[in-house]
């Protein structure tokens, strides 16, 4: 019996996987890179490497967006939308709540709408909002990051107070 059989099978399999990977990267580069970045979403240095590779391939990386983004990196036309799960200190439950709320009630109209809708689920805190602002995930809500950073605390306090008033008023 030959001991070479298992090795030739292994090498053949590895060759096939390499061929399939190269084929996907060539014919579906945007989808391939989005999937590749999603596979290392918890490793910021690897994500940075792949973002650099995307730039070399002329693939644009769009910023994270609470109105368009998903938890993972996603394809947006011929571009890649940055995954919400790649933002530091944003937990999966928060991302799930954002996506589900958006799918159920439509796009978030402004910062107050966003905070009000997610505060009802008791899943949002000030640090999470701050990290979303810093990452640019709220940029499409009609304001600058500087403006958002200066008003989000007042909005959270206002929404919290309204919540307390509605409980007392019942």
Short names for language-model regions:
Residues 1-9:
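Single conserved hydrophobic/aromatic residue that forms the stacking wall/gate
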Residues 8-170:
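Noncatalytic, beta-rich nucleic-acid-contacting surfaces in large DNA/RNA-processing enzymes
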């Amino acid at each position: 019996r030959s001991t070479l059989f298992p090795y030739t099978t292994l090498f053949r399999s590895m060759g096939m996987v390499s061929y399939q990977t190269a084929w996907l990267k060539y014919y579906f580069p945007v989808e391939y890179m989005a999937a590749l970045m999603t596979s290392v979403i918890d490793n910021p240095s690897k994500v940075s490497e792949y973002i650099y590779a995307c730039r070399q391939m002329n693939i644009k990386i769009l910023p994270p967006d609470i109105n368009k983004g998903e938890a993972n990196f996603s394809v947006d036309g011929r571009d890649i939308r940055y995954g919400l799960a790649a933002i530091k200190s944003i937990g999966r439950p928060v991302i799930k709540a954002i996506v589900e709320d958006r799918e159920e009630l439509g796009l978030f109209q402004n910062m107050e709408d966003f905070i009000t809708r997610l505060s009802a689920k008791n899943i949002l805190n000030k640090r999470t909002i701050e990290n979303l602002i810093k990452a640019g995930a709220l940029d499409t809500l009609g304001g600058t990051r500087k403006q958002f950073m200066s008003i989000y605390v007042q909005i959270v306090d206002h929404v919290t107070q309204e919540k307390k008033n509605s409980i007392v008023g019942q």
